[in-house]
């Protein structure tokens, strides 16, 4: 199938979701050769990946990931009705590769949101283009990455947050590592990670590194069954909601996708220069994360509050971002967010 797929994509013919599933199965099973993998993902990038192609690839990666099982069906009470449903699991994650070298915003947000009572399955990896990815900063903070899937499940169940280290849970990706490194360009694999949470997170805030990915990835999340989510791109290039400029936000609900542009000012925050959000290496970013969770004020806290607000809306803990900002501020100022970090450090080092 992959030979036929390469021939089609070279002619700029889109693949169906079913065709993409077949190709990805060949790639992730080791059936496709390195040359075929490199040719395919390069041609696909030149053509431009469609919603159907990304969705098909994400389905295969999800199916082949080591599963993190969380929740066995709980009484879910929201403002409209009462029903028995799987426990809500949230992921706050970016594609990385935005080149802005900010501190680890989504990682900081994860502890704030978890301390508000949301189950967080934080999916992440080491640095892509910055000096410090989520795995790097967590390791520097004292969180052990060398844990079993059962430990991650236990962390989410017991304390409400666990870190899903992508290389440990996506073993089938090994077949694509060589071709990806050798061609050295961004491909579909750069956007698949945030779509393939092994815990099956059904609520999400997903940051992307290009504006033209916002709406397509929102439609992918919708097709993959996301209950509520936001795909965001800061117009300064950040794969987060930014304070320096406007942010494009695509909201995903059961009904579909809506897109709008937001500004920090509409939520009561002052805009700031990019340097105010910049980070450094793992040790430096760990100090920044801890200082924010310990109550430090300024633009870094503000950007965490705004991103946490949207995460709380996605998880159903806040009706709107304004309520989310208030809840996030309370979580930090009460000490609960910092305590959540300490709990994860302790649990992963037991």
UniProtKB/Swiss-Prot annotation:
Keyword terms: Amino-acid biosynthesis, Aromatic amino acid biosynthesis, Glycosyltransferase, Magnesium, Metal-binding, Transferase, Tryptophan biosynthesis
The protein's Enzyme Commission number: 2.4.2.18
Binding of Mg(2+) 1, residues: 106, 240
GO BP terms in the entry: L-tryptophan biosynthetic process
Cofactor details (free text): Binds 2 magnesium ions per monomer.
InterPro entries: Anthranilate_Pribosyl_Tfrase (IPR005940), Glycosyl_Trfase_fam3 (IPR000312), Glycosyl_Trfase_fam3_N_dom (IPR017459), Glycosyl_Trfase_fam3_N_dom_sf (IPR036320), Nuc_phospho_transferase (IPR035902)
Residues holding anthranilate 2: 180
Residues engaged in binding Mg(2+) 2: 239-240
GO MF annotation: an example: magnesium ion binding
Pfam family, one: Glycos_trans_3N
Pathway: Amino-acid biosynthesis; L-tryptophan biosynthesis; L-tryptophan from chorismate: step 2/5
PANTHER family: ANTHRANILATE PHOSPHORIBOSYLTRANSFERASE (PTHR43285:SF2)
Protein's UniProt name: Anthranilate phosphoribosyltransferase
